[in-house]
Design a protein with these regions (language model features):
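N-terminal glycine-/serine-/threonine-rich beta1-alpha1-beta2 phosphate-ribose binding loop
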Residues: 2-159
């Protein structure tokens, strides 16, 4: 049985294989200053109103946490209680690093669509691709607990 493999081809294949390993992005492997995706705590946030949205940034900014789902019976509302003039919207906008976020809407935003928007905007800005669409949303917490199988923890922010 003849083989077409010679020393030169073998070294070429070996070098190509070694090079492929070195192009794996650092954020995938983890290490000092990086948390590998497999090591992150996946969290669902139940409650996307005034308190829930402003509290969410504690989780979003933690490198060892990944918010993967939000839940609120309201889909998208603008009738939440305001603590001070434009305080909730401006807190969310500052957390996102987008001062113009929903500026001029005149009302306090909230609901699961707003929660999902906040999570995806925050992670999009941090993603190498510039996009992130990995946050599920649920109207009922029972559906979340039944269907979201990749959740390690749940944070409940409801009245």
């Amino acid at each position: 049985m003849a083989s077409d493999m010679n020393r030169r081809k073998f070294l070429g294949y070996a070098a190509a294989s070694a090079g492929a390993v070195t192009i794996v992005p650092r954020h995938v492997l983890g290490g000092a200053g990086y948390v590998a995706p497999s090591e992150k705590i996946t969290v669902a946030n139940i409650g996307c109103g005034t308190q829930g949205l402003t509290e969410m940034f504690g989780m979003l900014t933690a490198p060892e946490v990944q918010v993967v789902a939000v839940c609120d019976p309201n889909q998208d509302s603008s009738d939440y209680v305001e603590w001070g003039k434009d305080s909730v919207r401006s807190t969310i906008a500052a957390g996102l690093g987008r001062p113009q976020w929903r500026k001029g809407a005149g009302r306090v935003p909230g609901g699961r669509d707003v929660g999902k928007e906040v999570v995806e905007l925050y992670y999009s800005d941090k993603a190498p691709s510039g996009g992130y669409r990995g946050c599920a949303s649920y109207a009922d917490f029972r559906d979340l607990l039944e269907n979201a199988k990749d959740i390690d923890a749940v944070k409940v922010m409801t009245p």
